């Protein structure tokens, strides 16, 4: 049998977050809301590392003509279809 808190607490938490919390946040000062948000809604502190050669990749994207690779691929597929 499931204990009462295992059923009661999630239901009450959902009701609070859906209906009561929006009204409470309107009354609280913005400074308190900014303080409480990271506590109530924690996020992962791990940062994704950026690539070391990010500038080189961006320059290559800028220098490459638009759709250059797709036209070559379509020509190759048309030629292979003709050969078969």
Swiss-Prot record:
The keyword Lipid metabolism is annotated on this UniProt entry: no
Protein name: UPF0729 protein F18A11.3
Record membrane topology: Single-pass membrane protein
GO (cellular component) term, any one: plasma membrane
Transmembrane segments: 1-21
Stretches of the chain forming a coiled coil according to its record: none
UniProt KW keywords: Cell membrane, Membrane, Transmembrane, Transmembrane helix
Cell location: Cell membrane
InterPro entries: UPF0729_C18orf32-like (IPR026776)
Similarity section: Belongs to the UPF0729 family.
């Amino acid at each position: 049998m499931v204990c009462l808190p295992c059923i009661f607490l999630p239901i009450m938490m959902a009701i609070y977050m859906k209906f009561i919390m929006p009204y409470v946040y309107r009354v609280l000062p913005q400074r308190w809301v900014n303080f409480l948000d990271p506590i109530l809604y924690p996020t992962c502190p791990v940062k994704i590392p950026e690539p070391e050669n990010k500038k080189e990749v961006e320059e290559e994207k800028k220098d490459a003509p638009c759709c250059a690779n797709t036209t070559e691929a379509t020509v190759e597929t048309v030629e292979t279809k003709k050969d078969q």
